[in-house]
């Protein structure tokens, strides 16, 4: 399958999602666990598989995508390629569900991983540096970056007349502890404003090797990813409000969404709108996003399982179609195109997993 800069949206003929075709469900789903629930051996096994993906050669060619140097980079490149469709859109939730499943599948098939994709429960770890995910030990996802005195607070304006000052994080420099110390990332950085453009920037796949930077920010995770926020999210009466709260767009009851702020809590590279998969914690963060969507869907199966809302492009750009269950999305070299109705249940279609 080729690598394209444009997402193709076509109609699928099957009406399985409407109950007119069989929708088989698996009987014995794999269970995805929170990182803190894993044994030492299971954490080390997952870390080893991630490092394996970094060591394996890419399937994309350097001639086609100059920045790729590893199989891991293939996944980042695919995410970049579809960024202008898959964020703050009706595609966001199902596309990322499938993307992290493809990552889990690659870990198993290409790197001998026998476990399931762990997730990061934001609520459990209000002190990030003390958490088993980011304490910098050999069984963590590495720790904070070195202190960078030049990092400054950030001002956000999520709504007219509303300014939020985000205090700076604790680090701001290269990650030097844990299994991913001196981790090299090759793509980006991207300016956030580039997400509003109609096409990817010319530098999208330029080779730019540098260290992974983190700046752990407890204020962010405690303010925007706490139990109250999660409860509000799960109390959403419909997919419109669920997406608004999760993403903070377009009309959120809370000003910033836990998806974006989970990214922000780890610093600039995890916050990169296009290239965030380069931080190994990306997969655990999006595991939590998918877990909450799953819990919300399960709470009202008949009405929520196949609920979709939104445009097929980031920021609901003008003259782009609304998504339907027949909308087909692409994953580049990672997989064949998939209609959204195949991606709506973690225990049907290609999937067979659940969460603790």
Swiss-Prot record:
Gene3D superfamilies in UniProt: Di-copper center containing domain from catechol oxidase (1.10.1280.10)
Residues bound to Cu cation B: 203, 263, 286
Function, as annotated: Tyrosinase; part of the gene cluster that mediates the biosynthesis of Asp-melanin, a pigment that confers resistance against UV light and hampers phagocytosis by soil amoeba. The nonribosomal peptide synthase melA converts 4-hydroxyphenylpyruvate (4-HPPA) to aspulvinone E. The tyrosinase tyrP then performs hydroxylations of both aromatic moieties of aspulvinone E. The product of tyrP is highly unstable, and, due to the high reactivity of methides and ortho-diquinones, the polymeric Asp-melanin forms spontaneously.
InterPro entries per record: Di-copper_centre_dom_sf (IPR008922), Tyrosinase/Hemocyanin (IPR050316), Tyrosinase_Cu-bd (IPR002227)
Catalytic activity: aspulvinone E + O2 = (5Z)-3-(3,4-dihydroxyphenyl)-5-[(3,4-dihydroxyphenyl)methylidene]-5-oxo-2,5-dihydrofuran-3-olate; aspulvinone E + O2 = (2Z)-2-[(3,4-dioxocyclohexa-1,5-dien-1-yl)methylidene]-4-(4-hydroxyphenyl)-5-oxo-2,5-dihydrofuran-3-olate + H2O
Region forming the signal peptide: 1-19
GO MF annotation list: metal ion binding; oxidoreductase activity
Gene source species: Aspergillus terreus (strain NIH 2624 / FGSC A1156)
Protein name: Tyrosinase P
Mod. after translation: Glycosylated.
A cellular component term, taken from the record's GO annotations: endoplasmic reticulum lumen
Pfam family, one: Tyrosinase
Disruption phenotype: Impairs the production of Asp-melanin. Results in yellow fluorescent conidia and accumulates aspulvinone E in conidia.
EC number of this enzyme: 1.14.18.-
Record's subcellular location: Endoplasmic reticulum lumen; Golgi apparatus lumen
Cofactor note (record): Binds 2 copper ions per subunit.
Phylogenetic lineage: Eukaryota, Fungi, Dikarya, Ascomycota, Pezizomycotina
